[in-house]
Every structure is written in structure tokens, then in C-alpha cells.
Amino acid sequence: MIGYNHSVSLRGASNLVKVLGHERTFLFEGETGIGKSAIFYSLMNYYGDKMGYNIIDCTTLDVGDIQMPRVVEMNGMHVTVFAPNHLLGFQDDKPQLIMFDELGKAPQGTLNGILPILQERRQGMNYLPEGSFVLATTNCASDGLMDTLKAHQRRRTVKVLVRKPHAGIGVDENGKEFVEPDSWMEYALDNDIAPEVIMFVRNHPDCLESYLDGSDSKRIFNPSREPSVDAFVCPFTLEVASDIVKVKQKISEEELTASLCGAIGTLSGVDLMTEVKMGYKLPDWGNLLSNPKTAPIPEDTMVQCMLMTKAIVTTAEDTLTALCQYMMRDKFKDEWEAVFYRSIMSSKKQEIAIDNDTFQKRAMEMNWIFTK
């Protein structure tokens, strides 16, 4: 068992690049599908138009995709120099952010051509613009996916183990649920993941356990099991499942079930369908927002939980008041209302909540104490 000792979260990985990525190349190693590629996109959002951006898929690279030889004359002699691929951004004036995705799967010849970029920000006689960042990702060698680097290649980088995001549902001293920071749940609530998928993870948190920690969950990829076992829930496949669930009205139940089983495995696909069927019990959303004081409230507490989850995901400045008015009614479970308030205040939607009088008044009234 390897374990996740001395590892960082995805957020921690991004911070390492921000602080030292212009001087050193970080090689982020982690299980397949945990979101390593998302490190690049979070950095892109952070730096905006200050940099040029290039993500290179090493699984499809050939030597010619990195550099091509050309003959030039120097001091009366013809010599060979290497011209870099324009996708690497050597020709641009602004600093570049380059990520070599799946570096461990690059062909050896191609990998050798990448090494000067990793260590010296150089390809041939060409140097990246000052202030450029280079990073790379690879899967754990223990995954058995042919991700291996030789010693002379490995030492060109700072290898950092990135841990798999945990499900992220905690329970406080009063027995109340809350969303833990730096978790998959926190990400899901901020990134429009289907409520049914969020509920699935809440009810089956083992789907985001790791074989590196010795988990024997039948829902996750584990290289020690038979290859025929179709268990592969991970952050990436959960996003795929979310996209499938969002079009449930356009496909048959048979098509939906088959697609979900193909995305996350048979066991998890069938269990997710239970949440999908529960989602059909949600009240009409348009009516709820138009008539929050009279729209029907589901009696089933788990349907209320899913409703609360959908409210967190979909809350906007023009709907927050109606959602607060709906959930403060007597028939709505206080526990789910509390989770809604806490989740909004710890999410990207915090700003609209701070400026909403209904939200603030209810928070003070229930002793959740959020103030402007």
C-alpha cells in the first residue's frame, strides 16, 4: 500500500506552480481520472490574458511535434538546428504556461526532446519568454497504465503526489452535515454537477476512496483486481455521468441506464439510476421560484435533500430570495436548510448571499450568523 503521505490537493498543486513554477517544473503524479489536467485550467483562469496557454497531450506526440531539424549556414558551414513547434509558444512575446499532460506515456525519443524544456525552458537555441511556467502530469506507476520515467528524466522535475479528492461530507459536533473544504463536493456544488450525481456521491462516499489507501471499494479502479471488473468512478467519470443525467429527458430509461453503467461501472450506474428516479419527484422548479410560499414541499426527506442540492447548484442573484423563502417553511427540514446556507457562504456564490437581506435575516434568526 503506497498511501497518500506527503501529498497535496489539486488546489495545493496549483499553488506550487504559482509560487515556483517559473523556476522549477513540477511533475504531478496521481491516480487516473482525479483531475490533474484541471490544474492547468485553474491556472489559466487565474492568470487570464497575461499568459499564453498550451496543453500538450503526450500520448499522441511524435518527435516532429516537439522540434524539426532544419539546415542553416553559420560561418560558411551548413549545420543542423532544431525549430520548435509553434504550439509551444516560443515565438510569442508574453510568458507561456505549458503543461505536458500524461508525460509518462510519451515515446522515449519524444520524451528526450522534451527534457530541455522541462529543465532549462529551452528547445535547441530557443528559450521560452521570461516568466514562463512549465508543468507536467503523469499517472501513478502503480496504476499499471505504462506511466514510467527513467532516472535521468525524472530528475529534471520535482515530482509531487496529488491525492484523490475525497467525497467531502462532514458531520459537526451537533450531528449536522456540512461540506468539507478542498473536497469533490465543494467542487461539484460550484461547477454545475447534476444534483442526482451529487446525491449519489453523498450516499456512496466510498466511490471516491483510493486503492492507494487500501480501499477495497467495488466502485473504484484498482489495478490489483481482474481487468474485467468495470469499476471506475473518479472525478472525471462523475462529470461524464453528470452530462448524461442532464439529458435524461431526451433519452429512454434503457439508454440512460446503459450510458451511466458505461461511464462509471455497472454497480454505480444502477445505484445512480436510483437517484435519477428520485429526481423525478422534485417539484416543478419554475413554480417553486414563482410561488415559493405555496409551492408543494416533498415529504420524503431524501427528496428534500436533493432539492437543497439543486438549489445550491442553481442559485443565482435573482433566485436566492425565492429559494430562501421556500426552505424557511415549516415542512422543510431545518438540517437541509442549514446545509444550504453554509454551502452558499463557502462557495463562489457568497457575494450574492452577503447582499441578500432575506438570506442574512434568516441566518441571524436561526443563529447561523452571517453578516454583511
Can you annotate each of these PLM segments?
Residues 1-98, 103-372:
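C-terminal regulatory/interaction module of P-loop NTP-utilizing enzymes
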